[in-house]
Amino acid sequence: MPRIYLSPSTQEYNSYITGAGSEEYFMNLLADAMEPYLLANTIRFTRNTPDMTAASSIAQAARGSYDFYLALHSNASGDGSTEGRQRGIIAFYYPTSANGRRAANIFVENLKEIYPLPSLVTARATTALGEVRQPKPPSVLLEIGYHDNTADAVWIQDNVQNIAENLSRSLAEYFALPFIYPMTPRTGTVVTERDALNVRAYPAMSGQVVGSVPHEAQLTVYGQTDGWYSMGYGNLAGYVRSEYVRL
């Protein structure tokens, strides 16, 4: 199953013009809100911590094995005549990364559905950003609105849950997984006759078997769709038939 490195901003000194918090604060709220969606969609993740930096996040990701690197930021116009006047969302990707470009375009198309100025949601190639240039897997750095613009800052603050769902939906699309809404995690017990319960990479009998859960073992259910549960069992994630799990 897919595994991503999730890197919300660690820039606590970038204050929102509203005074409600910082870039670090709101991007970590966004990452918090994404976690249930990622688990429900069998996307495993490692996440940086606020005391880290972009450089240490990149280094931590380099020590692991990931299918994607996602950095969450909000933007600023900088000093000068445009300060506080710019708006929009930018999905940055590395120019020669086909999958980075594909992911950026998926994020853009989905974010256009919830951002009030869809024409200002764009994808852009760059070699200047470390979190785009240095990760080994395909990567995207999202600049989600301008925190020095009042309208953008308020939009972010009021739409953390909507943005989290939207980004998670984009990740599911990128990994060719059906999007599943999260449920309150529940412990389930495998109730096969004797055999272990197959765990599949996709919620269909044609889905690849990626592991199994022993008879009478307990697993955690995160979501459900059409007779399947999305679940976790130790380090194993995937989909199991719901009739073989007692909640």
List PLM regions with ranges.
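Long, well-ordered alpha-helical scaffolding segments within enzyme catalytic domains
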Residues: 29-39, 98-116, 153-181
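Catalytic-core regions of hydrolytic enzymes
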Residues: 2-89, 94-98
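Active-site-adjacent mobile loop/cap segments within catalytic or ligand-binding domains
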Residues: 4-16, 64, 71-74, 78, ...
